[in-house]
Regions:
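Structural preference for beta-strand elements that scaffold enzyme active sites
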Residues: 2-37, 67-72, 97-101, 155-161, ...
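Extended, H/D-rich, highly charged conserved domains that either
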Residues: 78-95, 99-112, 133-137
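A short mid-domain helix/strand-loop element embedded in enzyme catalytic domains
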Residues: 46-67, 113-115
């Protein structure tokens, strides 16, 4: 009651259609024919005497429908059309409730740079590259509207997950490489601002996951 499993998938349509991933999605939607579900159910039934508050009837009543929702994790730079194609596939072909993880770059370089500076994170180094390469806000809103309509037609739920991490430059050898991903406290004001803007654009009618 009130507990929801959620799958995560990415990063391109070709990969999601791969048999291994497809089997995983279908197995989570209904696990009754999967080896692991049968194995676990059999073990529980054979060891019901180990439980104080679980009966054989409780075990037999465990549903095989494990998960009916999925979140699309989009890499930075994922083309808008690829995002839309994947969600269309998940809604129409897989018939599963779908959420899209959005990037904080939707806010634009100038806003994010000023926000980081004003909040004491001026040491965060980044250029406008990802802001130009990622999905733009003016493209995101109409795309999300289309996907929301398709979900309604399919009798499914559609929304956004906020937000993905934010790529910043490695300047002090914090990690190997050239780029790392910002999360935690510094990301929160960006995520909540994306939420506020989308809520305004959709009159509060766009489901959001955090």
């Amino acid at each position: 009651d009130g507990f929801q499993f959620n799958m995560s998938c990415g990063y391109n349509l070709e990969g999601i259609k791969d048999k291994k991933i497809d089997d995983f999605i279908e197995g989570m939607k209904d696990a009754r024919d999967t080896e692991i579900f049968r194995e676990c159910r059999t073990w529980l039934l054979e060891h019901v005497d180990l439980f104080e508050h679980v009966t054989r009837e409780d075990i037999e009543a465990i549903p095989s429908e494990i998960c009916n929702s999925i979140t699309l994790s989009t890499m930075h730079g994922c083309p808008p059309q690829e995002i839309e194609n994947i969600v269309m596939y998940l809604l129409r072909e897989k018939h599963i409730n779908t959420y899209v993880k959005c990037n904080p770059t939707l806010l634009g370089y100038e806003f994010v740079r000023k926000a980081m500076d004003d909040l004491g994170y001026d040491y965060m180094a980044f250029t406008d590259f990802h802001f130009k390469d990622d999905l733009q806000y003016e493209d995101a809103v109409p795309m999300l509207r289309r996907l929301k309509e398709v979900a309604a037609q399919e009798g499914l739920s559609f929304g956004v997950k906020l937000t993905n991490t934010f790529p910043v430059d490695i300047k002090r050898q914090e990690l190997p490489g050239e780029e790392m991903y910002m999360s935690g406290k510094a990301l929160f004001p960006l995520s909540i601002t994306v939420a506020a803007r989308l809520a305004e654009s959709f009159d509060g009618e766009l489901p959001m996951s955090f």
